[in-house]
């Protein structure tokens, strides 16, 4: 028997559903985090249009969360931190699709070394998205190196603003909590990585798609197709990263292909197989996986 390709199965699945099955648009809010780029690839290939799925772009993790709270999206992409915040308000929110695990993609940068920051009494200007996983990373940094939190001036900015910071005052102590691809511009401005989820921060950061149980039931077929085309997009990335980048580069401008490839090394795709060790860590973090597609 001939082997049926994944693409052919997806086409049969889509064609087997009447257009009326997808009359209502499924809106998903998403940032330009490298782990979510398969969604943009699927959009550019027209796969999302076929099942009436629309991406709503957000400039930050916190804005992404606010879009969902305001009813401007039916599902949102984010970390387990944003999930835990929203779950307090809406207990029926569930993770339904996994993208990646940060393995260096979330990081802390500075214009001073950790030793200099630790041994100083000067104030520290800390730039971050406060209502996001950024805050957890900064708190971990403060605790790990016994830094007096009274020295910290918390400055809430979205990542597009943060990435435009310039290292023009060498005496001023600046700490920046960011994530790929925004770290690239900061590196060019003279800031250096001092900690990351690969080096020094033992934090589990999972990127997933979340929605309410009722919404999942209502749009179940669309979510299932979304899962299939996202997996297909990740395979396309692994098979031909240049073609993938050229397809979605407008969303990442001004990131270069080389910088994009560097960023990919700082995440681990978990869309298909979950190692048992990771499942254990997720359970300890109270992250449910029973509804994951």
Model-derived features: where do they sit?
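Short, glycine-/small- and polar/acidic-enriched structural segments
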Residues: 22-147, 153, 174, 180, ...
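Sec/Tat-exported extracytoplasmic proteins
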Residues: 72, 77, 87, 142-145, ...
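Proline/Glycine/Serine-rich low-complexity intrinsically disordered segments
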Residues: 113-119, 136-137, 142-143, 149-152, ...
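Secondary-structure end/capping motifs
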Residues: 217-292
């Amino acid at each position: 028997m001939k082997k049926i390709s994944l693409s052919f199965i997806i086409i049969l699945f889509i064609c087997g559903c009447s257009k009326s099955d997808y009359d209502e648009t499924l809106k998903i809010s998403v940032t330009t985090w490298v782990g979510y780029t398969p969604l943009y690839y699927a959009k550019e290939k027209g796969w999302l249009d076929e099942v009436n799925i629309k991406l709503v772009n957000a400039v930050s993790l916190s804005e992404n969360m606010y879009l969902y709270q305001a009813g401007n999206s039916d599902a949102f992409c984010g970390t387990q931190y944003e999930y835990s915040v929203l779950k307090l308000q809406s207990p029926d929110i569930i993770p339904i699709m996994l993208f990646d695990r940060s393995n260096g993609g979330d990081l802390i940068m500075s214009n001073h070394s950790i030793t200099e920051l630790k041994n100083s009494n000067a104030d520290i200007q800390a730039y971050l998205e406060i209502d996001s996983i950024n805050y957890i990373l900064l708190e971990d940094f403060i605790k790990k190196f016994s830094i007096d939190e009274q020295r910290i001036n918390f400055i809430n900015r979205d990542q597009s603003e943060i990435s435009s910071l310039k290292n023009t005052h060498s005496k001023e102590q600046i700490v920046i909590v960011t994530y790929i691809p925004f770290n690239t511009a900061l590196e060019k401005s003279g800031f250096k990585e001092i900690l990351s989820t690969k080096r020094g921060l033992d934090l589990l950061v999972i990127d997933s798609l979340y929605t309410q149980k009722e919404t999942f039931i209502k749009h179940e077929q669309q979510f299932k197709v979304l899962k299939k085309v996202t997996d297909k997009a990740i395979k396309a990335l692994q098979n031909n990263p240049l073609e993938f980048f050229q397809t979605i580069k407008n969303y990442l401008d001004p990131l270069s292909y080389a910088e994009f490839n560097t960023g990919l090394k700082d995440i681990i795709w978990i869309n298909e197989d979950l190692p048992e060790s990771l499942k254990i860590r997720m359970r300890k973090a109270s992250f449910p996986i029973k509804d994951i597609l």
